[in-house]
Every structure is written in structure tokens, then in C-alpha cells.
């Protein structure tokens, strides 16, 4: 699939089949994201790959609009130290979209669950604290989104 087709056919997948995603496929998605552009070429993002069912179940409880994470075969949390770059949110969004398009090109489905809410700082803090606890991410590190990855349900 070429990039234009991936852009046109990309959809949010919130129903996943039980077919597992290989570790190599997940690593490829993260590797592609590492090549994403970032402000001042800071590349401050980091990626946490989640494959444990219990962790995915707990992540799905971060807020009501991400319950579908419990059906994903894997998750990729984008994390960043906000002190490293003032463009941390934009940079993470670009990297997340790179993951998304690469996943579509590999026949995988993806959706992202927003953990950062610019208009509601308290809700943003609550969601991110939940994810940090589940994934043992230190305080002060932002988690703008968690992406669910898997093969779409037919």
C-alpha cells in the first residue's frame, strides 16, 4: 500500500481480532516513528510497547472513551519529558501519526486514546497519572496518548 492510499483508507479501529501482533511488527512501527520530524530535531519522545493483557485492561480504564483498548492486542504509549522540548505535544502527534500510517500499510488497525486534554488540565493530569501508574512511568513525564494496535475485527 502506498502512502496516499494509507492516508485515504486510514480509520480508527476500535474493534480488534484476537490475532496477536508480532513483536517484530511492533518494533517496526516504533522504528518508523523514530524517523518522524520534530521541532528543532529534538526527538524527545519515547515509546512504551504494551502487550500484557492485564496492563491493556487497566489502560482501558483511564477514561470512558478508551474502553476499546481492552480489545487491542498491543498498545504503544508515547511518553515525553516536557522539559526537553516546548513542542512535545506536536512532536508526539506527528510520531503517533507515523505509527498509524505504518500500521495501516501493514494491515493493522490503530486508534489513539488521548490522555492529554489541553482544555481540562485536571482531567489531563488524572488520565496521565493513571497511565504512569500502570506502566511505571516516572512523575513529570507526559503521556499524551496511548495507541491501541491490532488486526481489525472482520
Model-derived features with residue positions:
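Acidic, surface-exposed loops and disordered segments
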Residues: 1-154
Amino acid at each position: 500500500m502506498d502512502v496516499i492510499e494509507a492516508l485515504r483508507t486510514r480509520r480508527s479501529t476500535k474493534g480488534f481480532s484476537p490475532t496477536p501482533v508480532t513483536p517484530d511488527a511492533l518494533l517496526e512501527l516504533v522504528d518508523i516513528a523514530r524517523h518522524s520530524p520534530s521541532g528543532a530535531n529534538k526527538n524527545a519522545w519515547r515509546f512504551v510497547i504494551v502487550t500484557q493483557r492485564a496492563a491493556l485492561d487497566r489502560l482501558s480504564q483511564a477514561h470512558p472513551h478508551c474502553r476499546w483498548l481492552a480489545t487491542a492486542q498491543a498498545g504503544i504509549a508515547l511518553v515525553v519529558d516536557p522539559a526537553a522540548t516546548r513542542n512535545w505535544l506536536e512532536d508526539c502527534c506527528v510520531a503517533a501519526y507515523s505509527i498509524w500510517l505504518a500500521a495501516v500499510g501493514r494491515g493493522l488497525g490503530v486508534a489513539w486514546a488521548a490522555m492529554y486534554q489541553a482544555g481540562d488540565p485536571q482531567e489531563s493530569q488524572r488520565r496521565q497519572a493513571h497511565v504512569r501508574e500502570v506502566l511505571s512511568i516516572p512523575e513529570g513525564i507526559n503521556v499524551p496518548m496511548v495507541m491501541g494496535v491490532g488486526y481489525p475485527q472482520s
